[in-house]
């Protein structure tokens, strides 16, 4: 389960910036979407994700603020797609604890590398590793461009393999994406295609994670509308939690 909890720290399509204060001070002109994270039974709003798109050439989030229901910011992330859309550079910080994640896309004459830095929520140790870049690698919010790149395969019902970066492992793990019934992505207000994310290979055999992750994309815009699974953010008691996130775009 520990691998599962850390795996989805890199999963959601969320981006943000580092700020020193714990409260919002944003340029609402660039507000692109708001994701409302509910408890799985929709009994409570747990937090909201304020997504900002500051690059007019991209239909992608470039930063996000994670806000409590009272509006206070408890975590933020910045994202840079300039070197790779599916393996972007990210900077993530959680103000409630010591958790942080950084990635850097490195290029030289021979091959590209990804530098990964990770610090756990309950540790003062910051760890780094260099990984060889592959086209199948997904880093954090690079999941959206990956889905769009393989859109026709996915909506046709084909299984698409990927290597998802797991910052806590300083490594990637193999996953498969495949289309599933839209009822798994309940909460969407528009027509969507629903996909399920599962572990691949030996990870599937040993039951690497128990609960599937469902992601729903709007059929025309190809934007994420629903996320149903374990959150990339722990609760205020540093415990993992499942969420149902619905997105509204502006």
Regions flagged by a language model, labelled:
Residues 9-18:
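Bacterial N-terminal signal peptides
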Residues 25-83, 92-94, 100-107, 163-250:
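Acidic, serine/threonine-rich low-complexity disordered tracts
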Residues 1-4:
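N-terminal secretory signal peptides that target proteins for export/translocation
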Residues 19-25:
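Sec/Tat signal peptide C-region and signal peptidase I cleavage site
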Residues 117-196, 203:
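Solvent-exposed helix/loop surface patches that form functional interfaces
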Residues 72-155:
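Contiguous hydrophobic, core-forming segments of folded domains
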């Amino acid at each position: 389960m520990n691998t599962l909890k850390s795996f989805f720290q890199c999963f959601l399509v969320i981006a943000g910036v580092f700020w020193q204060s714990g409260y919002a001070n944003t340029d609402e002109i660039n507000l692109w979407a708001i994701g409302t994270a509910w408890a799985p039974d929709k009994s409570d709003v747990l937090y909201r994700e304020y997504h900002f798109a500051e690059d007019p050439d991209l239909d992608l989030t470039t930063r996000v603020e994670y806000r409590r229901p009272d509006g206070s910011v408890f975590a933020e992330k910045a994202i840079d797609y300039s070197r790779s859309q599916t393996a972007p550079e990210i900077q993530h910080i959680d103000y409630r604890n010591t958790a942080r994640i950084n990635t850097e896309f490195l290029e030289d004459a021979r091959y590209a590398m990804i530098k990964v830095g990770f610090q756990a929520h309950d540790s003062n140790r910051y760890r780094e590793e260099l990984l060889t870049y592959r086209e199948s690698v997904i880093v954090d919010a690079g999941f959206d461009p990956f889905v769009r790149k393989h859109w026709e395969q996915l909506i046709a019902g084909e299984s698409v393999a990927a290597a998802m970066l797991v910052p806590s492992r300083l490594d990637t793990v193999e996953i498969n994406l495949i289309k599933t019934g839209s009822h798994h992505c309940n909460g969407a207000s528009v027509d969507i295609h629903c996909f399920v994310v599962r572990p691949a290979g030996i990870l599937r055999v040993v039951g690497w994670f128990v609960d599937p992750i469902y992601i729903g994309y709007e059929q025309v815009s190809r934007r994420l509308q629903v996320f149903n699974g374990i959150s990339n953010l722990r609760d205020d008691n540093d415990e993992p939690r499942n969420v149902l996130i619905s997105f509204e775009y502006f």
